[in-house]
């Protein structure tokens, strides 16, 4: 009721107002008046009925509405502005408040609804520019209300009409307010149309969800069309821009939105009051800009937007394809064509009317695409969008564009509206196939045209639209985007004639693109890694790099300021690209300082408080990673970085092959075939020539025309792959010649045309025009000639049609072709020449014309030509790809960044380097440095060493700290470079590797620069021995000072005060607190570097330190100090890492500690001491070796540095460690003893004394308490003591050292368990042997070393201690230990093998060896049970060796020891041992018989014989050193030759004769030894004396007791053993007997000096050997235990005795016979003592010899015994029988 009254009030007031208007009273408006009156009457009647309470139902709505509408329609058709305004205002209100819905059918137009008529009526009120301005505004209001009202629905043509009308008002209206309002209304309308479409799908999705889900869901969050959820761009990005007379900038991230802005819909239901509020403000308020803006603002604030619903978030939507249709319009197709002219009342010459009739372009197959929509709203949106695209494509008029022209304004506003639509595009628009197709077919083609517009506004808008497409639609527009980049953007950047404005706008756009990580990576992945696409990313970076490097602004028609601005933008883009890469790969980055992104890591004075950095950059980017919305229409390729890298490599190969082909086709083909990119078959090559567009068409033509067989085959295959079926001849020829340029040579053309003709006839065999292929061939040739003739500028007289026909007479098998056919060919060629494929020459030519541009005007002309060409190419390409579907990969993998960076790092580096080098602009420098930082980060993350090093070196170079240029040239950019370098070190330390070298070098030089800059003198540099007072006075002093600082490479020679002041000022900033802290932070932050990085860091810090210390006069210790600091900082790292660090640092300390500059070395040693003390405090677990590694530098310094000061300091440092940290030292003991070992051999008494004191303290005291910890170094301790003992300069120390070694034995003895339980590196040592290996062996070994190395008194002491230890502790030794031990002991005798001075060697043998031999025998005897099995043979071998030496004393000792050994232990010998013993003796006997004595001749006398014997002898024994000490041969039976007697003898003779003499001595000694062994202690001398006494007393009783004694080894030896000894004795006797009988030889020897005053003889040997032999035999002969051997014994006795007696008879010399006296006494006495039976056997043999003896003058004793013998013979043979004892005659003294 109320509603009806309100409606009536509106209507009646409006009708009354119309009637009241004086214009209506005119006759022509009678129909209007009547209609108004009828309507008023009806309203009154209706109100009356309602007042009376009539309940009759109202009439049908449509009749009522019809009635009400007619007067308004008539009013709108009237020419009166006031009437029209009133009518429109009422209509607007009725629609706004829902009083008119217009759903009823239109009675006047079948198939239409009333609302369509209403809208048409409103639209028709606009009659062009002359329409009243108030009416225009009312039209706009009414139309906006109609579109936005929730109560009515308008679609298709009607909605297009509303948009068109507003569009026309915008163009035609002269009122600025109306223009602006119309434009704002258009924006709002589009917003509503597209938002409704989006909401409708959302609503359907919600409706579907309701029945499915049982549980109620939380309400779907709605958002306005302007919501960021739908708009992929942030609020701050490009929006629709105002059309104002002023030039506007390209919108970018920082650009403020225009006052129109993006019209956001209001939430909630429409408030109906708003409709009325508009009317109150409808009147124009003035023409000023401000007024216009204000009114627009008011209107827009109150526009009814109730229809706009919030769109749900993207995530809640189903895929567009799956959204179900609604009953309204299941499949709405595009409506049929309508003649628009009948509907358009727009400007006559501006037909921008919107047609709903344009169907989509046919697809590639020529079939029209059915435009299928799931809802009418989608169709509305599609029609509006398509119309706007077509409007934007309309060409501008000729001549320079007029900003006020309808054409230009139309183009601009259409582009602005398109931009608005795209920016607000929702999920449906972005994914529905119809819209994507529309974008491809209409918008992209439109952009290709507008994208090269010379009008800045158009160009700028095109760029903004492209940006939006790239953001939201790149998944669908892969090929279109490629065309944009390749043909437009990059061409504009590369073309030298481009205007600054165009370049600037392109680069602004690129700035936005380059700021989006997803976009940048996607470009690389989809184009550079696609075999069929251009290398967009690479080309983009190269172009930007060239711009960033800057070129001559004059060349490009730019001012220097413009050129700098462009350069900065270029750099900004390059930096953005790298930032994107950094952001993309940030998950791989590990920041040692736990900061999130590179952006945060600034120097302290630059740090950002809110930690934005790259995140901020990301927010400002064109699109986030979410920007790629996949759709059902597109199948994306899976993102596999490795696969893309393979493709990229293949692409590079193909590109290189094409490059080669374009120079030399055969080489290119060969290369591609070798690389497997091209098949070997001619068909493959032909296909390649067809498909590869990058091939040079001229080269392709030359290749195909070549006469070689291979080329012909390729050409045939090439032509055969063309399909000419059902093609006109000229069309076929055009197709054929599109692929290449005909070669210039006639023969080549001939071959090509011939094959073409054959192929054409083959494809068109049914044709009847050509008689044969020859006809086609000739005709083709004639067409080529005709094209040249008609279209070549060189040909002046063009061929006529008649001439052409005449020329082709008779070519068809002697007949003519039809004239009309040839005529049509002529006309076609005349109209359009046969265009052969263009090469790149055209584009290259335009790019290279920059040198030829004479003026700005010429440049603009050239540019316009190029832009036209560009537009033409781009449009053609865009149309070509409009139907193509190329899969787009949305990159997700981090690994893409590595190949991306590898591709572009060089142009990037060039740009940054040149920027830093040539430009002092701080912004340029800042960008370059930021770029380098990002580049270093990427190279670091992906381990690209070459690239990383290149960038870091660039930074180092521009810091001027390492450059050869003068540091006085330092500017702000160089200071910033230093700061950047420090930041890189701080943030990327984990990855820097070898690049640390450059950084640390710079930091070192920075410290040096700071010293100069702050005026510090050389005295502050450690190591300089001089000081200077006062400030710098003049450059001479300054130069000297700097040279003193080692600044030859930093400060150029003549530095005046002014330069110095300037330098100090610039360097002053590097000394600022922030820089100092930042540098320090690198070192303190080293603790956060990872295990590998810290090693690299330390390694290069050490290298820089070495460089600092290399200055001979003024070494610096900055880096060395830092090494010490970082050692402190990093000491708590895990041991594995620390040991790797210390391996480097320790090696450095080794070198520094040996630095020739003592101050440096002292600093190093002291630092080492401090570090060591701290390190030792941490202690060490068992079996670790960290201390050992840590303390090793002390050892090295001690070994290599000969400076007493340093050596003394090292000893004191170690002593301090021992005294304070003994309890914590474990493996470090090794180093400590190694240091003392070095000190032990020093000649400086103080050093030796100090070291020995500490060593003594360790051994005697510390070992007591910490022996288990020192076990591993026990051997080193003993070795160290040994070294002290061997220092001959300090005998007291030596003796004390030996005492301490003896003391060490006590530790081993007392703590065997500790040694047994200790496990370490030698785990292969059995637990039972550890006491030996770790304890006894080192002690005994070192004692043997002392014995071998020291002087007599020390070695004697060492020998004594060694054998004392053996005797004291030997009972604990295992058998195999003894073997090791005796190997050590026998080393004592090895000394003789060394060629030393004869006197020393002699002394050695006489003393030490002697001593050792006896000691060995003592030990062996003491531990015989343990030793005999394992060592007896070794001992015998050693004794044998001694006996064989050319040292009489040693030989005697050897035999003595052998004797002692056997006598002491013989009773324990087993038969086997006796066997070994006897064999040993036999061997000694035989090897020491001096056979050479019998044959030797001096030189010249039978030299050959002599030499032969000598050689034999030398092979068996050592004759290397001859002992000529006469005193040692004093006991020889041979006379000692005087010194004079040897003088004349050659040296070789002397050696030989001395050796022989010793052998004679040994023989005698051996005989005595056997005698002693067998009969000890009954010596032969005693027995001989007793025999003599007995003979004198003439009785045999005297020696009876000897016979009964049972001493010596006789009873322990078997007969066979004794027989062996007898063999020895007999051999010796035989030899000496032979020698003594050889008078001639004895004379030769005597003359040679072998004997002094008398001839040499061997009487003693001759007699003693026989005597011993006889004693043994007679002892055995009477031994009852050997009865079984008596026969052999008797035989031996008889032989020996008879030979002896026979020999005696032959002796002539009296003295010789005298020597035999005791021998004969022995023989006869012993024979007399045997029993009668045995005596008989002997007497019968001896009798004749004894008779012969009677003739000699014998001594009385011998005669007495002989007498007894004969008497006995008489008795035994019973020659006489004594009656009484007295009858035996007394010995005759006279005989």
From Swiss-Prot:
In vitro phosphorylated by PKA reducing its GEF activity and dephosphorylated by phosphatase PP1. GO terms for cellular component: asymmetric synapse; axonemal microtubule; centrosome; cytoplasmic vesicle; cytosol; dendritic spine; GABA-ergic synapse; glutamatergic synapse. It is found in: Cytoplasm; Membrane; Golgi apparatus; Cytoplasm, Perinuclear region. One of its GO terms (biological process) is protein transport. Transmembrane segments: none annotated. Residues 2-224 are annotated as: DCB. The modification Phosphothreonine is found at residues 244, 623, 633. InterPro entries: ARM-type_fold, DCB_dom, Mon2/Sec7/BIG1-like_HDS, Mon2/Sec7/BIG1-like_HUS, Sec7/BIG1-like_C, Sec7_C_sf, Sec7_dom, Sec7_dom_sf. This is Brefeldin A-inhibited guanine nucleotide-exchange protein 2. It comes from Rattus norvegicus (Rat). The lineage of its organism: Eukaryota, Metazoa, Chordata, Craniata, Vertebrata.
């Amino acid at each position: 009721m109320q509603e009806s009254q309100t409606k009536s009030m509106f209507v009646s007031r409006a009708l009354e107002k119309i009637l009241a208007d004086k214009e209506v009273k005119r006759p022509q408006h009678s129909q209007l008046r009547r209609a108004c009156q009828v309507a008023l009457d009806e309203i009154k009647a209706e109100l009356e009925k309602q007042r009376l309470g009539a309940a009759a139902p109202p009439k049908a709505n449509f009749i009522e509405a019809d009635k009400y509408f007619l007067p308004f329609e008539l009013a709108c058709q009237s020419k009166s502005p006031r009437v029209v305004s009133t009518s429109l205002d009422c209509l607007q209100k009725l629609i706004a408040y829902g009083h008119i819905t217009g759903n009823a059918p239109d009675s006047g137009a079948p198939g239409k609804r009333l609302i369509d008529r209403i809208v048409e009526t409103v639209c028709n009120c606009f009659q062009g520019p002359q329409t009243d301005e108030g009416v225009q505004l009312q039209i706009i209001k009414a139309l906006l209300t109609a579109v936005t009202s929730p109560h009515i629905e308008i679609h298709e043509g009607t909605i297009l009409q509303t948009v068109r009308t507003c569009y026309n008002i915008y163009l035609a209206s002269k009122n600025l307010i109306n223009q602006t309002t119309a434009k704002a209304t258009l924006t709002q309308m589009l917003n509503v149309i597209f938002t409704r479409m989006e909401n409708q799908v959302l609503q359907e999705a919600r409706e579907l969800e309701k029945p499915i889900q049982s549980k109620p869901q939380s309400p779907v969050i709605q958002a306005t069309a302007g919501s960021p959820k739908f708009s992929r761009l942030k609020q701050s990005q490009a929006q629709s821009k105002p059309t104002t007379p002023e030039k506007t900038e390209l919108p970018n991230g920082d650009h403020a939105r225009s006052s129109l802005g993006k019209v956001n819909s209001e939430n909630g239901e429409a408030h109906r009051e708003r409709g009325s509020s508009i009317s109150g403000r409808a009147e124009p308020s003035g023409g000023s800009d401000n007024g216009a803006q204000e009114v627009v603002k008011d209107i827009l604030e109150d526009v009814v937007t109730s229809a706009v619903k919030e769109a749900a978030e993207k995530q809640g939507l189903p895929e567009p394809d799956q959204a179900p249709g609604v009953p309204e319009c299941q499949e709405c197709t595009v409506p049929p064509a309508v003649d628009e002219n009948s509907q358009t009342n727009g400007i006559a010459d501006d037909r921008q009317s919107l047609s709903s009739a344009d169907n989509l372009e046919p697809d590639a197959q020529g079939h029209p695409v059915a435009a299928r929509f799931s809802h009418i709203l989608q169709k509305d949106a599609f029609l509006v969008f398509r119309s706007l695209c077509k409007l934007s494509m309309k060409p501008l008029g000729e001549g320079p564009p007029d900003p006020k022209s309808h054409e230009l304004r139309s183009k601009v506003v259409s582009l602005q509206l398109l931009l608005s639509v795209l920016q607000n595009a929702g999920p449906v628009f972005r994914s529905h196939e119809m819209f994507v197709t529309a974008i491809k077919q209409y918008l992209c083609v439109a952009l290709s045209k507008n994208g090269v517009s010379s009008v800045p506004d158009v160009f700028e808008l095109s760029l903004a639209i492209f940006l939006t497409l790239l953001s939201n639609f790149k998944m669908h527009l892969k090929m279109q985007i490629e065309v944009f980049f390749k043909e437009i953007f990059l061409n504009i950047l590369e073309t030298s004639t481009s205007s600054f404005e165009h370049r600037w706008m392109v680069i602004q756009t690129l700035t936005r693109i380059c700021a989006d990580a997803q976009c940048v990576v996607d470009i690389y992945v989809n184009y550079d890694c696609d075999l069929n696409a251009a290398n967009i990313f690479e080309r983009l970076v190269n172009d930007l790099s060239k711009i960033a490097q800057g070129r001559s602004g004059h060349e490009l028609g730019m001012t220097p300021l413009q050129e700098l601005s462009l350069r900065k933008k270029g750099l900004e883009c390059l930096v953005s690209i790298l930032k994107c890469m950094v952001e993309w790969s940030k998950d791989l980055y590990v920041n040692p300082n736990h900061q999130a992104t590179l952006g945060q890591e600034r120097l302290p004075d630059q740090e950002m408080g809110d930690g934005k950095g790259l995140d901020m950059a990301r927010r400002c980017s064109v699109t986030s990673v979410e920007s790629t919305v996949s759709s059902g229409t597109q199948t994306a390729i899976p993102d596999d970085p490795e696969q893309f890298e393979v493709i990229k490599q293949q692409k590079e190969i193909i590109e290189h092959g094409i490059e080669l082909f374009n120079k030399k086709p055969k080489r290119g083909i060969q290369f591609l075939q070798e690389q497997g990119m091209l098949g070997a078959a001619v068909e493959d090559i032909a296909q390649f020539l067809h498909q590869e567009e990058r091939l040079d068409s001229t080269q392709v033509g030359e290749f195909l025309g070549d006469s070689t067989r291979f080329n012909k085959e390729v050409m045939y295959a090439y032509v055969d792959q063309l399909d000419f079926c059902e093609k006109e001849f000229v069309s076929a020829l055009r197709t054929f010649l599109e692929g290449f340029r005909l070669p210039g040579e006639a023969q080549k053309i001939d071959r090509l045309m011939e094959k073409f003709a054959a192929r054409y006839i083959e494809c068109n065999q049914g044709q009847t025009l050509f008689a044969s292929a020859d006809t086609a061939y000739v005709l083709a040739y004639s067409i080529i000639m005709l094209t040249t003739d008609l279209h070549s500028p060189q040909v002046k007289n063009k061929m006529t049609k008649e001439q052409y026909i005449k020329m082709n007479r008779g070519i068809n098998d002697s007949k003519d072709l039809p004239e009309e056919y040839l005529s049509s060919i002529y006309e076609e060629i005349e109209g359009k020449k046969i265009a052969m494929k263009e090469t790149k020459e055209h584009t290259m030519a335009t790019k290279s014309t920059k040198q030829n541009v004479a003026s700005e005007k010429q440049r603009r002309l050239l540019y316009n030509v190029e832009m036209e060409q560009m537009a033409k190419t781009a449009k053609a390409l865009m149309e070509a790809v409009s139907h193509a579907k190329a899969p787009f990969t949305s990159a997700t993998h981090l690994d893409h960044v590595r190949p991306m960076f590898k591709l572009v790092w060089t142009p990037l580096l060039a740009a940054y380097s040149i920027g830093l080098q040539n430009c002092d602009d701080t912004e340029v420098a800042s960008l370059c440095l930021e770029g380098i930082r990002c580049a270093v980060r990427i190279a670091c993350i992906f381990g690209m060493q070459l690239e990383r090093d290149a960038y870091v070196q660039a930074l180092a170079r521009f810091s001027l700290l390492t450059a050869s240029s003068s540091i006085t040239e330092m500017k702000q950019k160089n200071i910033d470079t230093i700061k950047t370098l420090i930041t890189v070190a701080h943030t990327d330390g984990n990855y820097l590797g070898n690049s640390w070298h450059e950084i640390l070098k710079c930091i070192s030089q920075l410290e040096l620069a700071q010293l100069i800059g702050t005026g510090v003198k050389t005295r502050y540099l450690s190591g300089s021995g001089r000081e200077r007072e006062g400030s710098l006075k003049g450059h001479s002093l300054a130069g000297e000072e700097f040279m003193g600082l080692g600044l030859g490479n930093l400060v150029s020679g003549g530095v005046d005060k002014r330069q110095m002041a300037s330098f100090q000022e610039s360097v002053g900033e590097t000394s600022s607190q922030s820089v100092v802290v930042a540098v320090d932070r690198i070192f303190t932050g080293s603790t956060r570097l990872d295990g590998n990085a810290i090693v690299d860091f330390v390694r290069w810090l050490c290298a820089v330190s070495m460089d600092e210390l290399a200055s001979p006069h003024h070494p610096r210790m900055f880096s060395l100090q830092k090494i010490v600091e970082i050692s402190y900082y990093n000491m708590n790292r895990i041991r594995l890492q620390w040991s790797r660090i210390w391996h480097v640092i320790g090696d450095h300390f080794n070198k520094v500690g040996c630095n020739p500059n003592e101050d440096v070395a002292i600093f190093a040693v002291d630092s080492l001491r401090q570090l060591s003390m701290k390190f030792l405090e941490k202690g060490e677990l068992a079996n670790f070796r960290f201390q050992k590694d840590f303390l090793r530098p002390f050892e090295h310094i001690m070994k290599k540095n000969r400076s007493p000061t340093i050596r003394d300091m090292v000893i004191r440092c170690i002593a301090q460690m021992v005294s304070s940290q003994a309890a914590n030292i474990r493996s470090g003991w090794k180093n400590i003893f190694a240091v003392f070992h070095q000190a032990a051999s020093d000649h400086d008494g103080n050093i030796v004394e100090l070291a020995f004191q500490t060593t003594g303290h360790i051994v005697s005291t510390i070992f007591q308490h910490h022996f288990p910890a020192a076990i591993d170094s026990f051997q080193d301790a003993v070795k160290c003591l040994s070294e002290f003992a061997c220092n001959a300069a300090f005998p007291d120390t030596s003796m004390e050292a030996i005492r301490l070694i003896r003391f060490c034995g006590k530790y081993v003895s007392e703590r065997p368990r500790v040694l047994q339980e200790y496990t370490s590196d030698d785990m292969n040592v059995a637990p039972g042997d550890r006491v030996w290996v770790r304890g006894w062996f080192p002690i005994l070994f070192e004692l043997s070393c002392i014995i071998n190395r020291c002087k007599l008194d020390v070695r004697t002491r060492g020998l004594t201690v060694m054998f004392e230890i053996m005797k004291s502790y030997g009972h604990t030794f295992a058998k195999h230990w003894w073997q090791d031990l005796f190997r050590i002991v026998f080393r004592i005798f090895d000394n003789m093998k060394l060629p030393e001075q004869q006197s020393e060697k002699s002394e050695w043998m006489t003393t030490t060896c002697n001593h050792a031999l006896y000691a060995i025998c003592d030990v062996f005897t003491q531990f015989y049970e343990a030793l005999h099995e394992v060592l007896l043979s070794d001992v015998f071998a050693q004794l044998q060796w001694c006996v064989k030496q050319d040292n009489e004393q040693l030989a005697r000792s050897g035999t003595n020891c052998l004797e002692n050994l056997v006598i002491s232990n013989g009773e324990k010998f087993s038969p086997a041992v006796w066997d070994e013993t006897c064999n040993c003796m036999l061997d000694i006997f035989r090897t020491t018989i001096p056979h050479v004595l019998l044959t030797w001749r001096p030189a010249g006398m039978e030299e050959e014989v002599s030499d032969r014997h000598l050689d034999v002898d030398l092979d068996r024994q050592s004759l290397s050193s001859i002992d000529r000490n006469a005193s040692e041969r004093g006991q020889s039976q041979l006379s000692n030759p005087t010194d004079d007697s040897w003088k004349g003898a050659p040296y070789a003779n002397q050696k030989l004769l001395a050796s022989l003499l010793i052998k004679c001595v040994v023989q005698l000694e051996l005989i005595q030894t056997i005698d002693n062994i067998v009969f000890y202690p009954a010596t032969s001398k005693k027995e001989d004396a007793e025999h003599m006494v007995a003979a004198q007393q003439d009785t045999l009783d005297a020696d009876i007791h000897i016979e009964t004694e049972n001493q010596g080894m006789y009873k322990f030896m078997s007969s066979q053993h004794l027989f062996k000894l007898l063999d020895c004795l007999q051999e010796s006797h035989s030899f000496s007997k032979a020698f003594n009988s050889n008078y001639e030889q004895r004379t030769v020897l005597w003359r040679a000096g072998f004997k002094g005053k008398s001839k040499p003889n061997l009487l003693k040997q001759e007699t003693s050997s026989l005597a011993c032999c006889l004693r043994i035999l007679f002892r055995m002969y009477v031994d009852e235990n050997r009865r079984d051997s008596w026969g052999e014994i008797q035989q031996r006795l008889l032989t020996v005795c008879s030979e002896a007696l026979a020999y005696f008879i032959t002796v002539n010399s009296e003295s010789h016979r005298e020597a035999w006296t005791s021998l004969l006494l022995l023989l006869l006495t012993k024979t007399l003592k045997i029993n009668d039976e045995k005596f008989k056997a002997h007497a019968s043999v001896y009798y004749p010899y004894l008779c012969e003896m009677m003739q000699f003058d014998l001594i009385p004793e011998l005669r007495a015994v002989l007498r007894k013998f004969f008497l006995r013979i008489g008795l035994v043979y019973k020659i006489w029988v004594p009656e009484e004892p007295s009858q035996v005659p007394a010995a005759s003294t006279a005989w």
